[in-house]
Amino acid sequence: TNRSIFSVDDAMKFNLSGGDNAWDCTQYLNIWVCNLEGGTLGYATQPGDPADVDGVVIQYNALGRIGNLQSNFNKGRTATHEIAHWLGLKHIWGDTDCGDDHIFDTPQQYGYNNGCPSFPHLSTCSPNGNGDMFMNFMDYTNDACMNLFTNGQKLKMRALFALNGPRNSFLNSTACDSVTESGAALPTEVTPVV
């Protein structure tokens, strides 16, 4: 890209606004890594969104091993979380107080968790039993505290690749062929814009 910072408005997804156009979203998962303003770590489209914006956006210092990384968000879990959105998952709290993510084996929870809670972490929606599933990739805890998808979440994501599923074309994609065979040229040097 030729911009140093982007707002959460999809500008990074278009050459004309200083970003890079999406590749064929029936063959590739588009991932834009850039400097996002306002503390946003990332965001994603959902299956069925317009092809020219299809993919995920990740804050440049929320993954990797070198540079000025975000201390609590430097293990790549933002990418895991956003790709799961791209695969149809909602936040575990259903984006509303005691909401529903429509997954049979995730508990209801009041809202998102942050930091690294201790188990069990009970809330008004889960006052008994195991409490909130704060270690789920679809919560907002620190990267070091996230470690699982439930079986129900895995089934939902995998269903997108089934026959007639919105991501089914990936099963026959030639995108994993060598880059030169696919016709796409790689830059000789990749330097982040800071």
Language-model features: where?
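Extracellular (secreted or membrane-anchored) zinc-dependent metallopeptidases
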Residues: 1-192
